C-alpha cells in the first residue's frame, strides 16, 4: 500500500482511516442492509461491496484523501465511511468535491455522521485548501439532509 495507510483523522469519539481487509465483512453487511440502502438503486452483494471498499482505498492511495473507513476509537469497531470524493464530470456543477457518509444503522442518531463529516470539512478547508465542498442526497433522505444542515450546508 502507501504512506496513506497510516494516516488517520481523529475526533473525540471516532477515527477516520485507511481501509483494511477486516473492514470488508462489516461493510458488506452495511451495504446489504435494505434500510441503509433504501435511497440507492439496490443493496450491494459481497462482491460489489468489496470492490467499492477497494476502490475507496485506491482513491486514498492516489490522492491522500477520499472516503475513509470510520471506527469507534474506544473499541476500534468499524461503523461505516465518511469522506471526500472528487466528482469531475458527473453533474451540472462539476467539477467539485463532495462530502459523503454511510453508517451502519445501529450507529444512527448518535451524532457520528455529523462528527465525522465536521472533521472531513476541516480537512478539506484547512489541509486541502478547497474553496468549496458540496453535498447531495435523495430528496426523501431527511436524515442526511439534517446532517447537511448541522454542517451549515
What are these regions (language model features)?
Residues 1-106, 119-123, 127:
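GNAT-family acyltransferases
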Residues 20, 80, 113, 141, ...:
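Conserved phosphate-binding and hydrolysis motifs of nucleotide-dependent enzymes
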Residues 64, 109-111, 129, 152:
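Glycine-centered helix-boundary capping/hinge motifs
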Residues 89, 140-142:
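Residue-level marker for beta-strand->alpha-helix junctions and adjacent short loops that shape enzyme
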Residues 127-136:
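Conserved GNAT acetyl-CoA-binding A-motif
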Amino acid at each position: 500500500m502507501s504512506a496513506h495507510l497510516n494516516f488517520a483523522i481523529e475526533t473525540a469519539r471516532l477515527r477516520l482511516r485507511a481501509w483494511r481487509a477486516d473492514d470488508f465483512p462489516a461493510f458488506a453487511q452495511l451495504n446489504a442492509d435494505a434500510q441503509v440502502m433504501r435511497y440507492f438503486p439496490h443493496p450491494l452483494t459481497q462482491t460489489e461491496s468489496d470492490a467499492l471498499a477497494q476502490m475507496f482505498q485506491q482513491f486514498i492511495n492516489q490522492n491522500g484523501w477520499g472516503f475513509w473507513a470510520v471506527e469507534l476509537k474506544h473499541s476500534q469497531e468499524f461503523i461505516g465511511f465518511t469522506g471526500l470524493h472528487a466528482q469531475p464530470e458527473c453533474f451540472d456543477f462539476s467539477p467539485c468535491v463532495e462530502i459523503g457518509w454511510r453508517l451502519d444503522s445501529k450507529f444512527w442518531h448518535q451524532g457520528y455522521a455529523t462528527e465525522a463529516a465536521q472533521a472531513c470539512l476541516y480537512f478539506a478547508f484547512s489541509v486541502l485548501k478547497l474553496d468549496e465542498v458540496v453535498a447531495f442526497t435523495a430528496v426523501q433522505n431527511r436524515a442526511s439532509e439534517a446532517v447537511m444542515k448541522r454542517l451549515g450546508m
